[in-house]
Swiss-Prot record:
SMART domains: Elp3. Its main location: cytoplasm. Its EC number is 2.8.4.3. [4Fe-4S] cluster 2 binds at residues 171, 175, 178. This is tRNA-2-methylthio-N(6)-dimethylallyladenosine synthase. It comes from Clostridium novyi (strain NT). CDD domains: Radical_SAM. Monomer. Residues 390-452 form the TRAM domain. It is an enzyme of class 2 (transferase). One of its GO terms (cellular component) is cytosol. InterPro entries: Elp3/MiaA/NifB-like_rSAM, Methylthiotransferase, Methylthiotransferase_CS, Methylthiotransferase_N, Methylthiotransferase_N_sf, MiaB_methiolase, rSAM, rSAM_horseshoe. Catalyzes the methylthiolation of N6-(dimethylallyl)adenosine (i(6)A), leading to the formation of 2-methylthio-N6-(dimethylallyl)adenosine (ms(2)i(6)A) at position 37 in tRNAs that read codons beginning with uridine. Residues 16-134 form the MTTase N-terminal domain.
Amino acid sequence: MEDLVLDNNTKNIYNKRFFISTWGCQMNEEDSEKISGLLKGIGYTRTDIRDEADVVIFNTCCVRENAEQKVYGHLGELKALKRKNPNLILIVTGCMMQQKGMPEKVMEKFPHVDIIAGTYNSYKLPEYIERVKTEGNSIIEIWDKEKGIVEGLPVDRKSDIKAFVTIMYGCNNFCSYCIVPYVRGRERSRDPQNIIDEIKDLVSKGYKEITLLGQNVNSYGKGLEPEINFATLLRMVNKIDGLERIRFMTSHPKDVSDELIKAMAECEKVCEQGHFALQSGSTEILQKMNRKYTREDYLTLVKKLRKAMPNVGISTDIIIGYPGETEKDFEDTLSIVKEIEFDSAFTFIYSKREGTPAAKLEDQVPEDVKHTRFNKLVEAVNEIMARKNKEFEGKTVEVLVEGPSKNDDTKLMGRTRSGKLVNFNGCLDQVGKLVNIKITKANSFSLTGEII
């Protein structure tokens, strides 16, 4: 493990503002919280107005092509701003930059970019900013591989109630469509005591809910001495006084052990919720994806989860249009969605990622077929979600109050233990508290209720 030591000559920046935009998963969100913490630590303040910032940071994603296109669009927009303010420092970091050849491509197309960093060295951004200011030259700094885990980074968290805590980095699964192992590196786990200490510190500051993060949390502990597994870590976190709720993601279906399900059911602070990415309901497609489980394996997992926790909320990811997907394969996916009845599902059209095995496959599904299947799947998912939400009407649920509703600032919002979003009337002094809500109305993607 490596502790961060900030160079003292970077601590001389005052009255400067930074703007950060984040694409991608919760891991990226937590990375941005750390970047924000680092910059605040050297005197910067954060602004939500991009055009008034002295430093603009794009923390990028490359899981799908659409995310990359958005970054290109924003970089193009900043050309005029850079011309207007030559002292503006523009930074691009994250997964997109870790791809082979991408930094050079971005710098060639957008020469007004000042700093390009990858996923392994974003904690060095304060140093890079200082170098640009003193030397005046652009910086491309991409590390080929991880250099251990950096502990002790300052974190500027978005919420005062809930926090992400990363427990491991990287992925060893190499699903055939996925770029993540190539840009996030091999699996490496944090020391359990460092995780416990971080959570205890958060609880002492008033945090009530922790989400344990990893590309595959089920692989946690491999390679540590003494070896520990994720189920054991869950039980350790569950013992922390003052912590109310524990969630985790992402969890690979093939690695969900009976021991983990038992821990989820027995640990009273672990919420009855899990995100288990199905990706396809066709065993043939799952094999091509290198997912290492079958349709029946996934159905068995769901049965085990629901037997152990009858009220468990199960969410998933589904990819439509993987190379070679036939109409039968799609119907297999549609039928398993209807059989399981997920509480929510994130659905995606397959996006070809250069450098992955799937990108070399020739049997690509026509775009119009992809979209037809996608629309049919989304319709089924939404119908199931609306129907399952309807079942909550008249029931009383426990909700952790998170703050004002995003859609109606006259209301408060929070989530049930199973992950359902609930909006209700209340007072701001209830933020951070657990309250009982009677559900009065079910909406397509949320619930409405009243405090009892």
